[in-house]
């Protein structure tokens, strides 16, 4: 079954931005959280999956997303864009505040079905990437690792880069790993199929 048969992915809008759980939507719609370091391509991933150019704002300035942004998709599903982590120019106080906000959402939100953890296919995972993956495994939160910016690497080297990332993350073979490009749309179908299977 394709995502188009299940929901109209083009019928999407930003619903609200929240700093804590008192602002979360109060219903039982399933949610998919998207986490990753600043400038990993979360906004481009959201826009590509939803077939929209500017629904999620892409920015040349890392660390721009400072709240949990909830996107309503056809009144059947929500994407939750969490603040990008690991950006040095953001103060330690702000990073600590974001970390607490992200942790509160990931640990306490009953609507959460799966976290899409985005990493950059071109580079080894950072310590922040590793900590996020370990955090999700510790709390037994389902996770899909999506390696972005695949178009920046020759296709013949994808497997090598994937192996490096998996080794660094101590990747659980039962989890899903998807190589993705918002430019070529590689990984688009696999990403939707994997997300929908978790709902």
From Swiss-Prot:
Gene it is expressed from: engB
Ranges for domain EngB-type G: 28-199
UniProt-annotated binding residues for Mg(2+): 43, 65
Keywords associated with the record: Cell cycle, Cell division, GTP-binding, Magnesium, Metal-binding, Nucleotide-binding, Septation
Task of the protein: Necessary for normal cell division and for the maintenance of normal septation.
CDD domains: YihA_EngB
S-S pairs: none
Pfam families: MMR_HSR1 (PF01926)
Protein name as annotated: Probable GTP-binding protein EngB
């Amino acid at each position: 079954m394709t995502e188009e048969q299940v929901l109209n992915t083009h019928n999407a809008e930003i619903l609200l931005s929240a700093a804590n759980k008192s602002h979360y939507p109060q219903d039982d719609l399933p949610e998919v959280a998207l986490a990753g370091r600043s400038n990993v391509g979360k906004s481009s991933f959201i826009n590509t999956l939803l077939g929209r150019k500017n629904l999620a704002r892409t920015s040349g300035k890392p660390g721009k997303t400072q709240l949990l942004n909830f996107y309503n998709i056809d009144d059947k599903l929500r994407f939750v864009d969490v603040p990008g982590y690991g950006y040095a120019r953001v103060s330690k106080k702000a990073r600590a505040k974001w970390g607490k906000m992200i942790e509160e959402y990931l640990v306490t939100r009953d609507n959460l079905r799966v976290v899409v953890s985005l990493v950059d296919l071109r580079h080894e995972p950072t310590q922040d990437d590793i900590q996020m993956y370990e955090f999700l495994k510790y709390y037994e939160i389902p996770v899909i690792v999506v390696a972005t910016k695949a178009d920046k690497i020759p296709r013949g080297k994808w497997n090598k880069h994937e192996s490096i990332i998996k080794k660094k993350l101590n990747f659980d073979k039962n989890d899903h790993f998807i190589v993705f490009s918002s430019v070529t749309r590689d990984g688009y179908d696999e990403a939707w199929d994997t997300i929908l299977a978790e709902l």
